């Protein structure tokens, strides 16, 4: 339980919800299906940036970043389905809701708000080819 709290506190402190920042450097990315050797290990993820579905034409996206071992230099960044990332962390936080700090309770509220902002109507209006899922190597 303590490890989950530490992980959430260190990794999720940097969550940014960007509903109106269309000029942020490449907030909309392509989600690719990666082979196992190209996946980021959960314990190596240092930052997770969530992009609102209103920023990327109805798509909820997330950027998962991992630094080079022993440095602050970003070497790996992966694009992910933001709705899945948000759902995963909501599930973890709700399982341990009685032990959450006020900061993590606030994070849970923010994540639930972001999750609630997603609608099928947004996706139906999206250009599905713009951020199409690609099979990667």
UniProtKB/Swiss-Prot annotation:
Disulfide bonding pattern of the chain: 28-56, 29-79
User: Signal peptide: which range, if any?
Assistant: 1-25
Swiss-Prot/TrEMBL keywords: Disulfide bond, Fusion of virus membrane with host cell membrane, Fusion of virus membrane with host membrane, Glycoprotein, Host cell membrane, Host Golgi apparatus, Host membrane, Membrane, Signal, Viral envelope protein, Viral penetration into host cytoplasm, Virion, Virus entry into host cell
Localization (cell): Virion membrane; Host cell membrane; Host Golgi apparatus, Host trans-Golgi network
Q: Does the keyword Glycoprotein apply?
A: yes
GO cellular component labels: host cell Golgi apparatus; host cell plasma membrane; membrane; viral envelope; virion membrane
Q: How does it sit in the membrane?
A: Peripheral membrane protein
InterPro entries in the record: Herpes_gL_rhadinovirus (IPR020175), Herpes_gL_rhadinovirus_sf (IPR038313), HSV_GL_alphagamma (IPR034708)
Query: For this chain's UniProt record, which GO biological process terms are given?
Result: fusion of virus membrane with host plasma membrane; symbiont entry into host cell
Cite the residue spans of the region called Interaction with gH. 23-128
State how it assembles: Interacts with glycoprotein H (gH); this interaction is necessary for the correct processing and cell surface expression of gH. The heterodimer gH/gL seems to interact with gB trimers during fusion. The heterodimer gH/gL interacts with host EPHA2 to facilitate virus internalization and fusion.
Which family does the record assign? Answer: Belongs to the herpesviridae glycoprotein L family.
Q: What does this protein do?
A: The heterodimer glycoprotein H-glycoprotein L is required for the fusion of viral and plasma membranes leading to virus entry into the host cell. Acts as a functional inhibitor of gH and maintains gH in an inhibited form. Upon binding to host integrins, gL dissociates from gH leading to activation of the viral fusion glycoproteins gB and gH. The heterodimer gH/gL targets also host EPHA2 to promote viral entry.
Name of the protein? Envelope glycoprotein L
């Amino acid at each position: 339980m303590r490890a989950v709290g530490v992980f959430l506190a260190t990794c999720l402190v940097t969550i940014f919800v960007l509903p109106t920042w269309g000029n942020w450097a490449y907030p909309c990315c392509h989600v690719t299906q990666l082979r196992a050797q190209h996946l980021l290990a959960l314990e190596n993820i240092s930052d997770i940036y969530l992009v609102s579905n209103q920023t990327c034409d109805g798509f909820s996206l997330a950027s998962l970043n991992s630094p080079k071992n022993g440095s602050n230099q970003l070497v790996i960044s992966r694009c992910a389905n933001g709705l899945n990332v948000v759902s995963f962390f909501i599930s973890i936080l709700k399982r341990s809701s009685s032990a959450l700090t006020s900061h993590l309770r606030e994070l849970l509220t923010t994540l639930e708000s972001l999750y609630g902002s997603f609608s099928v109507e947004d996706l139906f209006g999206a250009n599905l080819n713009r951020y199409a899922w690609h099979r990667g190597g």
